[in-house]
Amino acid sequence: MIDMAEENGLYAIISYHVIGRPGGWYESDSDTTMLPNYPAKVHYTDSDMAVAFWNKVAARYGQKKHVLFEIYNEPAGKLDSTNDDFNWAVWRPTGQLLIDTVRKHSNNIILGSGPKYSSDLSEVPSNPYIDTNLVYVAHIYPNTVTKEEDQVAGWEKRFGFLTSTYPVIISEWGFHDGGKDETTRGTAEGFAKPFLDYLDQKNLPWVAYVYHPPDDEPPMLERDWVTLNEFGLFVKKRLEMAQ
């Protein structure tokens, strides 16, 4: 995949794709609505494993200039908490450790994540990462902003305000009208269009997630792995408009 991206003039993001709080493991609920006997997803979130991963991967791909390194997919507290105890101050030392690990092997762009499933960068200005080639990331979905909040104000509070000081990329966004995951449940008109219009106003890059059928959410494909659903068609149209 890395070589294919290079051959086609594309960037490639390598993500340490775990969810949870460093220092243990994280288990999601099993989901038999997706597939029969669908197992729970277990993420082993030990920091030593993350360091070992980046020592290996950054050393292997660190000289390929089209490769970006996303240090940790979604730092978060436990499923049964509000994540309020897992804030920027708690997460930042681990994030900085992983940044420093990648830097031993590469000068490429690093994508730095924040707490609450990479949805909240509000505390970054109080103690930002130390690095000279870093972009902050946010993962934003239809219900990242609570129903009690104004949608645009919620985006501005979580990541938009930071763009006047630091580079930011939305490395995950998407929607699924009817999926099990409440966080990703939304529509093109209610979420995707206003969200991408907001990103255009901020001149922010984005990566839609995920090019996959419905056993992962939010999917862009139907179960035949070929047919685009509402989300997939929306992304395709926006990419065509940008050409």
Predicted features along the sequence, with ranges:
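Catalytic-core regions built around general acid/base machinery
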Residues: 1-7, 195-198
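Aromatic-lined carbohydrate-binding surfaces of glycoside hydrolases
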Residues: 2, 10-31
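Structural helix-adjacent loops and short alpha-helical linkers that scaffold large soluble proteins
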Residues: 7-9, 104
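Catalytic nucleophile-loop/oxyanion-hole region of alpha/beta-hydrolase
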Residues: 29-45
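Extracellular glycoside hydrolase catalytic/binding regions
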Residues: 40-68, 72-205, 209, 213, ...
